């Protein structure tokens, strides 16, 4: 992959930095794994805004990605690597020996034509999925389950990975990209390697319109609103908040802890590093 610096032919192009997709498949996505995706624009069934700053954006189909990788002991051949508009990672179309095709998250260095396999007897090779109890300590892994059989939930974004630190009894300790160390059941599955498209973080959008293509609407500052719309609103001329920073509903926003101490708190060995 390469980083593409755009010629400054306009203000929007001047700061834009794109990631090359020359190595990706150029054709249409596999129709058997596409589903319609209806845009809600952040509204619920009453038409009320439940998530701000959403709306518009380019239409696209949802690619059904296999996060469970539960087709054990059946080898699959990588047919192509594709762009997925629904996520930062690339996806790979694999064809199993019995003819079934599935999309998976594409790991780094996975080549077209490579063979991957899932199951407890799978070799330790990039793209293979195994229970954590069968993965050597110190391995780099991604697409990690939190509950056995529930499907991957951790380390699915572009360039992300985690490290298997230790195994104690029925739990393993895994260090996340954030620095958090968490206990995960050894029967949970994980995939060897790290997620591809690691240069995604170098991308520069260049102009506000790119955000609109993504379905993200502008975020207006509270001090620029009227007092009926935000606690920071109102005043003559340019004024500050006049109080501690709050959200539109009056809740503190700076230095205020929002995480609930859920029952899964006991699974965190070490909190994430700031």
Curated annotation (Swiss-Prot):
Database matches in SUPFAM superfamilies: Nucleic acid-binding proteins, Translation proteins SH3-like domain
GO biological process entries: cytoplasmic translation
Coiled-coil boundaries: none
Residue segments, region Disordered: 224-256
Any single Pfam family the record assigns to this protein: Ribosomal_L2_C
InterPro entries membership: NA-bd_OB-fold (IPR012340), Rib_uL2_dom2 (IPR014722), Ribosomal_uL2 (IPR002171), Ribosomal_uL2_bac/org-type (IPR005880), Ribosomal_uL2_C (IPR022669), Ribosomal_uL2_CS (IPR022671), Ribosomal_uL2_dom3 (IPR014726), Ribosomal_uL2_RNA-bd_dom (IPR022666)
GO CC terms in record: large ribosomal subunit
GO MF entries: rRNA binding; structural constituent of ribosome; transferase activity
Keywords linked to the UniProt accession: Ribonucleoprotein, Ribosomal protein, RNA-binding, rRNA-binding
Basic and acidic residues biased stretches: 229-246
Assembly description: Part of the 50S ribosomal subunit. Forms a bridge to the 30S subunit in the 70S ribosome.
Record HAMAP family: Ribosomal_uL2_B (MF_01320_B)
Family: Belongs to the universal ribosomal protein uL2 family.
Functional description taken from the UniProt entry: One of the primary rRNA binding proteins. Required for association of the 30S and 50S subunits to form the 70S ribosome, for tRNA binding and peptide bond formation. It has been suggested to have peptidyltransferase activity; this is somewhat controversial. Makes several contacts with the 16S rRNA in the 70S ribosome.
Protein name from the UniProt record: Large ribosomal subunit protein uL2
Species in which this protein is naturally found: Acidovorax sp. (strain JS42)
Lineage, uppermost ranks: Bacteria, Pseudomonadati, Pseudomonadota, Betaproteobacteria, Burkholderiales
Gene name of this polypeptide: rplB
